[in-house]
């Protein structure tokens, strides 16, 4: 992530933590870390985000025209500055959005801001700049009509989280329409779930879609989530290596082919979301997942994650194994692994707070600050499903 703005001030880790408990001893907070793991896990109890999370929110909101959540319009200057490929923008917006939902749950004073940003996130998600690859690749001009669960699953979950956070019915009709499309497509398919591109089935993208059905049920008292059992049975029977606690890379229903490589980022993403729906499922495979993929190093202070088996290389493939495992560790309440992974991920990215805004000089992946933000604030997908309504609803807006 590179910015054209000049650096005017850099806040030290100790100064950053002022006002959020006593600063940790140097041995507890390595250079390049911005808060302790204990402080991240205590945010909800304290009803306050850590100062570095507040600085991340400033990055997302503060600078006119170029902050990601400046306006509902189809301007994407923030992503251009980060050199985010068009096909990745949908994921960037979605993971920001899931973090914003947790911010709303953590701090009642920030709930209105989180809802405002979620509104902008949904609006931007519908811009053709976000979904245009579907048309460009020749798959159709309507990104939600069929398939494309890699896009419409996120959009549906974002619709639901926006209404949970704000109480607003702004997108309720669109949400109902898309939920029916997803549910009916699942019911019509001879396999459990929906493909991304034609004949490309990814379990992690389906985890988003099924979780979106649970959120819809929470809002409207329906029972779309009943489809989840058949999906979990399917992926457990056909798409997971039970000995290694890992999902295979992809499934191709027309031929029945399953790519034989297991994938850490696929598994971490999926187990994190499934834990919100069926905790026992994720808890069954989490220890085996760690044994298969996680390498602890630097005398126990750090951990990194192999993307697949048979290699010692960390973060191969799409480069997101460690970051998604950070989210999974947070979802599972695993403070030790969360701390080790953050020690591995954050310091090399050279974070700084400039004019109250967090930025990373050397982000480690295309979704680096999105996933670190999400993991730092993540209250748990089950907790989001149980989110209490806002004190004052924006009904009808």
Curated annotation (Swiss-Prot):
GO CC field: periplasmic space
Any Pfam family? Ldi
- Single Gene Ontology MF annotation: hydro-lyase activity
Q: In which pathway does it act?
A: Terpene metabolism; monoterpene degradation
Q: Kindly identify the residues recorded as the active site.
A: 64
How this protein's activity responds to pH is stated as:
Optimum pH is 9.0 for the linalool dehydratase activity.
Impact upon substituting residue 205 to A/S? Loss of activity
Question: According to the UniProt entry, where is the signal peptide?
Answer: 1-26
Activity regulation per the record? Is inhibited by molecular oxygen, high salt concentrations (NaCl, KCl, or MgCl(2)), urea, and Ti(III)citrate. Activity is not affected by EDTA.
User: In which compartments does the protein localize?
Assistant: Periplasm
Catalytic activity line of the entry: (S)-linalool = beta-myrcene + H2O; (2E)-geraniol = (S)-linalool
Q: How does activity depend on temperature?
A: Optimum temperature is 35 degrees Celsius for the linalool dehydratase activity.
Record-listed (2E)-geraniol binding positions = 196
- Domain of life the protein comes from: Bacteria
Keyword Endoplasmic reticulum listed: no
Please cite one Gene Ontology biological process associated with this protein: monoterpenoid metabolic process
Q: What is the effect of changing residue 74 to S?
A: Loss of activity
Question: Outcome of altering residue 154 to Y?
Answer: Loss of activity
Effect seen on changing residue 127 to S: Loss of activity
Disulfide-bond pairs as recorded: 74-127, 196-205
Q: How does it assemble?
A: Homotetramer. Homopentamer.
What is the annotated role of this protein in its UniProt record?
Answer: Anaerobically catalyzes the stereospecific hydration of beta-myrcene to (3S)-linalool and the isomerization of (3S)-linalool to geraniol. Is thus involved in the initial steps of the anaerobic degradation of the monoterpene beta-myrcene. Also catalyzes the reverse reactions, i.e. the isomerization of geraniol to linalool and the dehydration of linalool to myrcene. In this direction, the formation of myrcene from geraniol may be seen as a detoxification process for the monoterpene alcohol. Shows a relatively broad substrate specificity and can use various geraniol and linalool derivatives.
Further notes on this entry?
A: Requires DTT as a reducing agent for full activity in vitro.
Name of the molecule in the record: Linalool dehydratase/isomerase
């Amino acid at each position: 992530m590179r910015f054209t703005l000049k650096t005017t001030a850099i806040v030290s880790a100790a100064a950053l933590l002022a006002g959020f408990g006593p600063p940790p001893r140097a041995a507890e907070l390595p250079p390049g870390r911005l808060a302790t793991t204990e402080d991240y896990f205590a945010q909800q109890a304290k009803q306050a985000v850590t100062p570095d999370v507040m600085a991340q929110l400033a990055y997302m909101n503060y600078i006119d025209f170029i902050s990601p959540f400046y306006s509902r319009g189809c301007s994407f200057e923030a992503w251009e500055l980060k050199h985010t490929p068009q096909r990745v923008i949908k994921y960037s917006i979605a993971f920001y959005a899931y973090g914003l939902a947790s911010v709303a749950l953590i701090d009642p004073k920030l709930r209105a801001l989180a809802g405002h940003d979620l509104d902008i996130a949904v609006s931007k998600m519908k811009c053709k700049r976000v979904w245009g690859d579907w048309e460009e690749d020749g798959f159709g001009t309507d990104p939600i009509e069929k398939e494309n669960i890699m896009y419409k699953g996120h959009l549906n979950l974002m619709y639901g989280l926006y209404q949970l956070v704000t109480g607003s019915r702004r997108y309720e009709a669109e949400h109902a329409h898309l939920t029916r499309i997803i549910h009916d497509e699942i019911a019509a398919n001879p396999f459990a779930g929906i493909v991304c591109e034609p004949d490309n089935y990814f379990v992690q993208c389906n985890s988003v879609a099924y979780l979106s059905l649970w959120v819809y049920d929470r809002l409207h008292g329906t029972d779309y989530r009943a489809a989840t059992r058949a999906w979990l049975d399917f992926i457990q029977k056909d798409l997971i290596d039970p000995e290694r606690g890992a999902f295979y890379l992809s499934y191709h229903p027309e031929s029945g082919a399953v790519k034989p490589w297991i994938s850490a980022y696929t598994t971490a993403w999926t187990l994190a979301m499934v834990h919100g729906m069926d905790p026992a499922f994720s808890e069954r495979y989490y220890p085996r997942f760690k044994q298969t993929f996680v390498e602890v190093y630097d005398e126990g202070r750090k951990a990194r994650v192999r993307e697949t088996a048979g290699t010692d290389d960390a973060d191969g493939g799409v480069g997101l194994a460690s970051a998604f495992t950070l989210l999974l560790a947070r979802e599972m309440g695993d403070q030790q692994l969360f701390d080790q992974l953050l020690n591995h991920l954050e310091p090399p990215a050279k974070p700084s707070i400039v004019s109250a805004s967090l930025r990373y000089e050397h982000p480690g992946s295309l979704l680096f600050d999105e996933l670190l933000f999400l993991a730092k604030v993540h209250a748990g997908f089950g907790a989001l499903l149980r989110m209490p309504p806002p004190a004052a609803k924006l009904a009808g807006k």
